[in-house]
UniProtKB/Swiss-Prot annotation:
Protein name, as recorded: Natriuretic peptides A
Top-level lineage group: Eukaryota
Disulfide bond entries: C128-C144
Prosegment residue ranges: 24-121, 91-101
Post-translational note: The precursor molecule is proteolytically cleaved by CORIN at Arg-121 to produce the atrial natriuretic peptide. Undergoes further proteolytic cleavage by unknown proteases to give rise to long-acting natriuretic peptide, vessel dilator and kaliuretic peptide. Additional processing gives rise to the auriculin and atriopeptin peptides. In the kidneys, alternative processing by an unknown protease results in the peptide urodilatin.
GO molecular function, one term: hormone receptor binding
Lineage: Eukaryota, Metazoa, Chordata, Craniata, Vertebrata
Annotated stretches, region: Disordered: 49-103
InterPro entries (alphabetical): Natr_peptide, Natr_peptide_CS, Natriuretic_peptide, Natriuretic_peptide_atrial
Amino acid sequence: MGSPIAASFLLFLAVQLLGQTGANPVYGSVSNADLLDFKNLLDRLEDKMPLEDEAESPQALSEQNAEAGAALSPLPEVPPWTGEVSPAQRDGGALGRSPWDSSDRSALLKSKLRALLAAPRSLRRSSCFGGRMDRIGAQSGLGCNSFRY
C-alpha cells in the first residue's frame, strides 16, 4: 500500500517540476522586443507633443498674470459721503442722467468679468468636491487641481 502512494507522490512531483509555470506570468508574457517598441512609441509621442512648461515661456505667463491682475483691480475709490447733495445730483446728473444710472458701471463690470473668464487657469478656483476635502485628499490634492500658486 505504501508503494502506490509513494509512486503517485513521486509522479506528482515530477509533473510539478517539469511543467512548472512561472510564479509571475505577467513578466513572462512581455518580451524585450515589445518593451523596446513601446519605449520607441513613447519617445516619438514626447517629440510630437511639447511639454506644457515649454509651451508658454515664464515671461508670457507673467504678462498674462499682470493683465489679469489689472483687469481684476477693484473699482475706483469713491470719496466718503458727507450727507450733502451737489446741484448736479439734484438736477438729475450732469448729462441728464439720474444719479442711479449704472450703464457705465455695468459696462465696467462686464469688462472685468470677461477678463476674469479669459484669465489663465491658475487664477481660477477649483471647485472639486465642493471646494474642501477632508484629511488625505486635502493634503495630497487627489481629484483636484493641485497646482496652486
